[in-house]
A protein has these predicted regions:
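N-terminal and secondary-structure boundary signal
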Residues: 1-172
Length: 172
């Protein structure tokens, strides 16, 4: 499972999402090694209760990369959840995370208002499907509390490899 950064229906030129050519290169390496590759995430930025993840896969270029390279997209908003008891309460994470043999986290190099720089850690927040992310943001309103939530998600998800896309960094 390639866990990309798919914040919303953004093109790669915005530097808001993992660059699709970066994802393509990693997908090719894995497909050459006979791996079944999934490209997955749940977008942020839900408006009026509608998550834009499906549209985000198209606009970002991930849908095209998956089709051209023999991978599958996994829209975490539509794949179901698994409830996990954690030190910060019960968390509901996307089911593909528990079905994948191996998780590669592909964050985007960018800053974030909740922590200045979050590196690979913040990207796994997208493992929380759909509108549930807003509730976690609300329940952890300051950087210290939000950081604790991110740490727990990273413990549970346990990505085996983190490779950051720094093709174009984003600030703000």
């Amino acid at each position: 499972l390639l866990k990309v950064n798919l914040i919303g229906p953004k093109t790669p030129e915005t530097a808001a999402v993992t660059h699709p050519e970066f994802v393509r290169a990693i997908t090719r390496i894995l497909v050459e090694r006979k791996c079944e590759v999934w490209i997955g995430d749940s977008s942020g930025g839900a408006i009026a209760g509608i998550s834009p993840t499906g549209r985000s896969f198209v606009v970002s270029g991930f849908e095209r990369v998956a089709m051209e390279e023999g991978a599958k997209t996994k829209n975490f908003d539509r794949e179901g959840v698994i409830g996990v008891d954690t030190s910060v309460g019960k968390m509901y994470l996307a089911k593909p995370l528990f079905e994948a043999d191996f998780i590669i986290n592909l964050p985007k190099l960018k800053t974030h208002s909740a922590g200045i720089y979050t590196g690979a850690v913040k990207n796994l927040f997208g493992c929380i499907p759909g509108l549930r992310k807003a509730a976690y943001h609300k329940g952890a309103p300051n950087p210290k509390e939000f950081g604790a939530v991110l740490a727990v998600i990273n413990e549970v998800v346990n990505a085996g490899l983190h490779i950051m896309d720094g093709i174009t960094a984003m600030e703000g």
